Curated annotation (Swiss-Prot):
Protein name as it appears in the record: C-C chemokine receptor type 8
Gene Ontology molecular-function annotations: C-C chemokine binding; C-C chemokine receptor activity
Matching PANTHER family: C-C CHEMOKINE RECEPTOR TYPE 8 (PTHR10489:SF627), CELL ADHESION MOLECULE (PTHR10489)
Pfam families, alphabetized: 7tm_1 (PF00001)
Localization terms from the record: Cell membrane
Keyword S-adenosyl-L-methionine annotated: no
Lineage: Eukaryota, Metazoa, Chordata, Craniata, Vertebrata
Organism in which the protein naturally occurs: Macaca mulatta (Rhesus macaque)
Length: 356
């Protein structure tokens, strides 16, 4: 959904209107006046997302050792967010200068963005289905919720689906010179306008409508089951995933709504100069909001995850003990024992596993 690289709509490059499809109305268009501020914004997002999601991966791999299928999904979700922000360093340079990385990297960077978006939404959807099975169909879940199922079958299927959904979006990406400035963007003319509308609806359907429908079904069933059974352990088991789902919807729904309205505008169902300018402005705002989601999940884990902060503390203590040993010092015995608990502590894996 990287409209950051679509010059006809976003903050990432100057406006360009192929043929007469999106010719500017009379009056001032929304232009990018503060490139430096936007570049700083991308840098901050990249740093915080890289740090936060790397810590999540470290906790899952080192402390929890990927003991259950939920850990596998959380690991893939963190990888999706990292893939999403891979484009930010390129976009930062793009803000300050021009696209100097060539056509291949134009498609590759855009591809990482789209794959990161799709895979993130798909894994959140998969986690919701997983919680549904664990709570509503606990006996059946014990049979199907295996590490092998999560790592080989479902995870690979999600990544493959995300890649396949991305390919049509990359066909029209190219590098061209506008007023002597190299730009990376998706180009549509009168003949290919239908593909722009198709890809917009594809993102609406695959990135929001289908996941949202599954979310609603799963959590209505889960809440009904919890209301009937009053199981405190099951309530704790779904809380974190539910918060992640709600946060993702809050960050992505506004952009998808604007994307849908933009498709209607391209089809001339919505028309007029005022609507065009309002959609351009709304795209700027909702795009920036959606970008921020890549930093949110680690923050949620830190505040909601019961064991996440504990695992981070154990990793930090263990690192400190190694530093002290390297420096020829000794830590107090109690600290050393606590630092080693990260590897010695065992977690019970069942159909209702605790998350971080």
């Amino acid at each position: 959904m990287d409209y950051t690289l679509d010059p006809s709509m976003t903050t990432m490059t100057d406006y360009y209107y192929p043929d007469s499809l999106s010719s500017p109305c009379d009056g001032e268009l929304i232009q990018r006046n503060d490139k430096l501020l936007l570049a700083v914004f991308y840098c901050l997002l990249f740093v915080f997302s890289l740090l936060g999601n790397s810590l999540v991966i470290l906790v899952l791999v080192v402390c929890k050792k990927l003991r259950n299928i939920t850990d596998i999904y959380l690991l893939n979700l963190a990888l999706s967010d990292l893939l999403f922000v891979f484009s930010f360093p390129f976009q930062t340079y793009y803000q300050l200068d021009q696209w100097v990385f060539g056509t291949v990297m134009c498609k590759v960077v855009s591809g990482f963005y789209y794959i990161g978006f799709y895979s993130s939404m798909f894994f959140i959807t998969l986690m919701s289905v997983d919680r549904y099975l664990a709570v509503v169909h606990a006996v059946y879940a014990i049979k199907v919720r295996t590490i092998r199922m999560g790592t080989t079958t479902l995870s690979l299927l999600v990544w493959l689906t995300a890649i396949m959904a991305t390919i049509p979006l990359l066909v029209f990406y190219q590098v061209a010179s506008e007023d002597g400035v190299l730009q990376c963007y998706s180009f549509y003319n009168q003949q290919t306008l239908k593909w722009k509308i198709f890809t917009n609806f594809e993102m609406n359907i695959l990135g929001l409508l289908i996941p949202f429908t599954i979310f609603m079904f799963c959590y209505i069933k889960i809440l009904h089951q919890l209301k009937r059974c009053q199981n405190h352990n099951k309530t704790k088991a779904i809380r974190l995933v539910l918060i992640v789902v709600i946060a993702s919807l809050l960050f992505w729904v506004p952009f998808n709504v604007v994307l849908f309205l933009t498709s209607l505008h391209s089809m001339h169902i919505l028309d007029g100069c005022s609507i065009s300018q309002q959609l351009n402005y709304a795209t700027h705002v909702t795009e920036i909001i959606s970008f921020t989601h890549c930093c949110v999940n680690p923050v949620i884990y830190a505040f909601v995850g019961e064991k996440f902060k504990k695992h981070l503390s154990e990793i930090f203590q263990k690192s400190c003990s190694h530093i002290f040993i390297y420096l020829g010092r000794q830590m107090p015995r109690e600290s050393c024992e606590k630092s080693s608990s990260c590897q010695q502590h065992s977690f019970r894996s069942s159909s209702i596993d605790y998350i971080l």
